[in-house]
């Protein structure tokens, strides 16, 4: 799986991951503000929410 792995303020970067999922994490009240992206599907703590997907570069 190829996932985006950059933090919000950094340029886009990708990584080939061993996990079968990618994720993006954002603040629940502001879905447009994505704080980070990466491999896997971590559990988020309030006020963050994680959205996971199963496709190359699906966490855009």
From Swiss-Prot:
GO CC annotation terms, alphabetical: extracellular region
Keyword Membrane appears in the UniProt entry: no
Protein's UniProt keywords contain Secreted: yes
SUPFAM superfamilies named in the record: Snake toxin-like
GO molecular function: calcium channel regulator activity; toxin activity
Disulfide feature: 3-22, 17-39, 41-52, 53-58
Principal place of residence: secreted
Tissue/organ expression: Expressed by the venom gland.
Keyword entries, A-Z: Calcium channel impairing toxin, Cardiotoxin, Disulfide bond, Ion channel impairing toxin, Secreted, Toxin, Voltage-gated calcium channel impairing toxin
A Pfam family hit: Toxin_cobra-type
Region Important for binding to L-type calcium channels, annotated ranges: 41-48
Subcellular location, record wording: Secreted
Record family assignment: Belongs to the three-finger toxin family. Short-chain subfamily. L-type calcium blocker sub-subfamily.
Function: This specific blocker of the L-type calcium channel (Cav1/CACNA1) is a smooth muscle relaxant and an inhibitor of cardiac contractions.
Further comment: The sensitivity is higher in cells of the cardiovascular system. Neuronal, and insulinoma cells L-type calcium channel are more resistant. A total resistance is found in skeletal muscle cells.
Protein name, entry field: Calciseptin
Origin species: Dendroaspis polylepis polylepis (Black mamba)
